[in-house]
């Protein structure tokens, strides 16, 4: 097969995954999916290997490569035959590869009575039952506390919705209308995916399409090998998660040698009776994302890269726990720390490619009451990079979602937003400043339960190359005028009128702040990104307010900087 045809089929397949995402977004019910875009779509081979994916959520996509293959293997093991118009549903993290809120749907692509591949999507449902509204809480001790566990089962049988299974699911969740609407949107997305793949086959032929898919895997394998062929290194690092009064270590050693990459998590903290555990699928997703980001962001992401990558994640650790350890937080927080520790290790080999640490948390806010549940993640600062400041107020690394529009929150939930702003002085000082964190303030308009799942409250996002650390996160509840600090992982009841203040971490700085352009510092002060005090203390630049403007006192600044 000629290379042009292979490329056309490969690109067409990727776009089909993108179109699946468009359909899912446009037909979804919940704000978390239709507004925040907390979902992912992919196309896989007949044995469950990842062929193509849309540019959606990294933690979903990397784990989909594990989860779909596990599901296909489960169906074979249990002698469950999947027919042409069936749709499989699964959310068991130890099969599907993330956490219970992420419900995966899978549909076979039949051609000439044979399965030639699968279309799949994964979407974060705002509630799947369990201990707390939103199904994510730091208080849980085992998986059963986190919600309804669905093994691979037929949600659609011969084209008809399995109402018995759907009734079972909706009887165990707090917002059944949302669950039904989002599941139907996922089904519609799969139907479009199958339809488009069959049209591709009609145009090029089934053998040609599957051959092009296989060649795309070969290409990714060879592409990655070509990028590391001349690299021979061993890099090590450790970073930490915060849980109560403990620091939970993630140890990691990377060896790049002879066109292969080995990532070894030996020495990482043992699994916890707390939800910080990350199932193997999350570890794979985080590892592959971090390596791609550093080695070559243009690396085509499919199963071919796993032929080059060997991940050693010891069992019964927080990066490969044993069921029924709880895992809801591992998906959203431990995933971020895995990326950080890999970046930290690779900085020594790739100093020009690795940024300072980003905010390092998805900053999860889950609020719910009788008959409703609200979930969002809040962005923070991106780390400063060689040649560029970190981006302010963005979702970094393992998440790729949008913020929830204030108008949507106030229309859909008994919540009022009092403030949504950037945190002055939260970005780490550096030649290239870290991005700023976010302040978001909520007022409760009814009694409810709040869960905060965040990190980098004690250990700040690190800077590199003499850059300073970004600011830690700070979270508060204001009750009866009293401002009460929260830890990064809290679940508590709130009363109508209570106020919740979330301050997300900033990104670390890159390079010495004394090398930062003075004019950029002046602009930062004018834009209220850094204060006059920070300019003086961290950058050795004296700025004074003159009338309604700010100016640099160059004489004093030269003294401060030794110029």
From Swiss-Prot:
Q: Which Pfam families match?
A: Hydantoinase_B
Among InterPro entries, the record links this protein to: Hydantoinase_B (IPR003692), Oxoprolinase-like (IPR045079)
Q: Which cysteines are joined by disulfide bonds?
A: none
Q: A single Gene Ontology molecular function, please?
A: hydrolase activity
Q: Which family does it belong to?
A: Belongs to the HyuB family.
PANTHER family per the UniProt record, alphabetical: 5-OXOPROLINASE RELATED, HYPOTHETICAL 5-OXOPROLINASE (EUROFUNG)-RELATED
Q: What is this protein's record name?
A: Uncharacterized protein MJ0963
Its source organism is: Methanocaldococcus jannaschii (strain ATCC 43067 / DSM 2661 / JAL-1 / JCM 10045 / NBRC 100440) (Methanococcus jannaschii)
